Amino acid sequence: MSLDPAIASRLKRNEAGLFSAVAQERSTGDVLMVAWMDDEALARTLDTRKGTYYSRSRQQYWVKGETSGHTQYVHEVRLDCDGDTVLLVVDQEGAACHTGTHTCFDTDVLLAVE
């Protein structure tokens, strides 16, 4: 599977050929997680509407929820103004974080409204 050249030409990748992907829950607006993608992961996501990412540690693709059942159905994919990050607007089934929490950003609040 290959990424549409019109999309690929707009992406800015790091030295490893990767760019960041932010998953946001469609119903709440919550930022759920941040992961890495390459062209193939983005192409698979666009084709299947399943959040597909690239694991730097395992050096392989993974589909969110493939083993846990905590799937992401992708409604929208947006490219940021710099071309180095994509936003996936998803319906999250179950926990988004590998720790079992709804979002990866709900445990350590460094600053909040008083």
UniProtKB/Swiss-Prot annotation:
Q: Which cofactor does it need?
A: Mg(2+); Zn(2+)
Q: Which domain of life is it from?
A: Bacteria
Gene Ontology molecular function terms on file: magnesium ion binding; phosphoribosyl-AMP cyclohydrolase activity; zinc ion binding
Q: Cite the EC number.
A: 3.5.4.19
Residues recorded as binding Mg(2+), renumbered to this chain, are D80, D82, D84
The record describes how the cofactor is bound as:
Binds 1 Mg(2+) ion per subunit.
Q: InterPro entries this protein is in? A: PRA-CH, PRib_AMP_CycHydrolase_dom, PRib_AMP_CycHydrolase_sf
Which protein, by its recorded name, is this? Phosphoribosyl-AMP cyclohydrolase
Q: Which UniProt keywords apply?
A: Amino-acid biosynthesis, Cytoplasm, Histidine biosynthesis, Hydrolase, Magnesium, Metal-binding, Zinc
Q: What is one cellular component GO term in this UniProt entry?
A: cytoplasm
Q: In which pathway does it act?
A: Amino-acid biosynthesis; L-histidine biosynthesis; L-histidine from 5-phospho-alpha-D-ribose 1-diphosphate: step 3/9
Q: Which organism is it from?
A: Rhodococcus jostii (strain RHA1)
What the entry lists under HAMAP family is as follows:
HisI
Location in the cell reads:
Cytoplasm
Family assignment from sequence similarity? Belongs to the PRA-CH family.
Q: How does it assemble?
A: Homodimer.
Question: Per the record, what are the reactions this protein catalyses?
Answer: 1-(5-phospho-beta-D-ribosyl)-5'-AMP + H2O = 1-(5-phospho-beta-D-ribosyl)-5-[(5-phospho-beta-D-ribosylamino)methylideneamino]imidazole-4-carboxamide
Predominant place of localization: cytoplasm
Biological function:
Catalyzes the hydrolysis of the adenine ring of phosphoribosyl-AMP.
